[in-house]
Structures are given as C-alpha cells and as structure tokens.
Amino acid sequence: MSKRIRLGIVGLSADPSHCTNYIHKIPLTTTPLKEKYEITAVSMSSPEKAEAAAIAHGLPRERGYHSVESLAKDPDVDLVVVSVKVPRRAELAMAAIEAGKDVYVEWPFASNLAAAEALAQRARERQVKSMVGLPTRLAPQVLKMKEILRSGSLGRILATNLLVTDDLFLKFHADKRHSHDKTNGANIVTIAGGHLLDAMAFLLGEFTTLHAHTSMLFPKPVLCDTDGNLKTGQFNDSPDTFTMHGKIGISEVPVSVCMYSHPPTTPNLFQWVITGEKGSLKMEGPSLMIHAIPPKLMMTSFGSETVCWEEISLENTIVSGAEYQAWLDNDTERIVTLDEAVVRYRMVDAILRSAESGQCTSYRYD
C-alpha cells in the first residue's frame, strides 16, 4: 500500500456528535478513503480537551495538541485540516501555512474579503497547497447538472432561479451564536449564499452584474441549549434573509435568488431551476445542505405532448468526503484553492455592498 496522507485535524473533539466528526472523520475512516488517508494528530483549545480528543480517536496522548503551531510542526502531519468556528479559521489556517504545511480549511474561512486575500497571498508566498471546503459543487446532483449542461441538450440557457427557505439560521445551538454578529462573517449570505452560489457559478459562470437586498426579520433569534431546549437569543445584527437578481456567465443569463429564514412552523424548501430552450433542470429537496441531505434532480424536455418533470436516477446521491477524493486526484476543476475562494469572497462583498448602497454592482473574477 502506498504511503497515506497524514492529517492533523484542528477541531476534532472527543464528542462523537460534533459536526467535525461527520464532515471529516467518518468519511476518512469508513470509506475507501481510509486506504489513502490517516488521522495522526488533533488540536483543541486546551490541553485537557486535546488529550481527551486524542484518546477518543485512538491516538497517543501526545498527539493531542492545544496549539495549531505545535500540530503543524509535527513531522507526521502532511495536511492540516481546520474545522472550527468561522471567526478563528483564518488565524489557525495561517499558523499551518506559516509552518509550511498544506491546508484544508472550511468555508467561510475569513470574516471579510481583506482577511481572505491575506490568507491566500501568504499561501502563495509559502508555496503550500490549499483547499477550501465548498463541497456543494461536488454533490452528485450538481455534477450531473454540469454533465447535462455541457452536452448541450438543454439548448440555449434562458434563466436560472434559486429559492431557499430554511429555519437553520434561527435555531442554532447556543454555541453558534457567533453567527448573529455580522463582524464574524458567518450568516445566511456567506454560508448558504457562499456554498450554493459557488455551485451556481461552477455550472454557469461568475455573476457579471448583481443587485442584492438583505434584511433582518428576526432581530432576536431563538437558540437551543445543548439539550435542545429553546431559549431566547441575543440580539442579532446579521442578515437572515437576502434576495438577488442579475446576470451570470458569458451569455449573461438572467438569474434570481431568494433565501430567507422562517420559524420551524413552515417546512424547509430548496428549489433550483435552470431553464433552457429545449429542456430544463430542477433540483428540489428539504434542505439547503444538498451535499449532505440529497435533493431530487429532475429534467424536462421539449417536444413531448405532455411536458412534465422526470426524476433522473443517480448511482449515488451522496458522496462522503468528495473533496478528499478530489485532492487525491489533483482535480483542479473540483478543488477550490484559497486563491479561487477569494473570488467567492469578492462575490459576497459585492452582495453586501449592493445591499447597503441599493445599487447594481459587480466584482472581479479573473
């Protein structure tokens, strides 16, 4: 067996219910990826948590670090994975880069465009490889849509529209309250918008012009304690709703986006339609997290007596750890580097600037 890539995961705690366990450890240890990767170190915020995490994941106690600097200096770590709350991602990823280690950091990885640009620049200077966690573009449904679009079977693309309604940003656990402080850059625009609009740009090209509006419908959101009990939240100054229209790609296809939060009194909905002259595609499901909770993919075609949506059968509806496979394959189309992710931050910045000014705007994506 060839040498496996050795991972040091920042934020992989002893708690098996923590999201880092689902996003990283499970696909790395329960799929064919386990033959290509191994977890050799973890890092947590205190010595006690670091030691507990190391023991929980079958590592020697000394492989539980309480600083990223120490983890990154470990000669048995090839790739540092940063999976912590948004406000600290850039700082911790920078520590790995300064140590000369390749880095995988989740999206969003910075609180603003300037911080994202600084991290990408330092990665270039240190000549390290990087990957940003934008797995929505790797969902089997999105890749199938790309295949169909490339085939030309839809004909000329006339428009695309995306509708997302979700209670996710109102029912965060109390430890996610940082998302309600706009300075942290962790809100419906950066998180839901960043992931889903990245997939849209992956299929159709970058937005050539956009006009956005954001609002805050719930200034005091509902939070849950660790037992799931509802409790009153702190005051919110982050947007919980945004809409956008504009044009996308070299053909300047009209685009409409609506993402809004609602209480759990209404079912969640994800719906994305790409309308073509010869046929159309529709993705529809119960969650905006389409890479984890799979939507149905449907297609219709022109020329039949009765036009209706027909579901497309996929061999797999979820591919756990798809970004890790892309890293192994050195798949430059599916891997999003820090430099490429800066373009997504420019898009987010343009959305927020447009919402503040009320004016149509654009961003640089060369």
UniProtKB/Swiss-Prot annotation:
Residues 1-19 form the signal peptide. This is Dehydrogenase aclE. SUPFAM superfamilies: Glyceraldehyde-3-phosphate dehydrogenase-like, C-terminal domain (SSF55347), NAD(P)-binding Rossmann-fold domains (SSF51735). It holds the Pfam family Gal80p_C-like. GO terms for molecular function: nucleotide binding; oxidoreductase activity. Pathway: Mycotoxin biosynthesis. Transmembrane segments: none annotated. Its EC number is 1.-.-.-. PANTHER family: CONSERVED EXPRESSED OXIDOREDUCTASE (EUROFUNG) (PTHR43708), GALACTOSE_LACTOSE METABOLISM REGULATORY PROTEIN GAL80 (PTHR43708:SF1). The keyword Chaperone does not apply. It is an enzyme of class 1 (oxidoreductase). Dehydrogenase; part of the gene cluster that mediates the biosynthesis of aspirochlorine (or antibiotic A30641), an unusual halogenated spiro compound with distinctive antifungal properties due to selective inhibition of protein biosynthesis, and which is also active against bacteria, viruses, and murine tumor cells. The non-ribosomal peptide synthetase (NRPS) aclP is responsible the formation of the diketopiperazine (DKP) core from the condensation of 2 phenylalanine residues. The lineage of its organism: Eukaryota, Fungi, Dikarya, Ascomycota, Pezizomycotina. The gene is aclE.
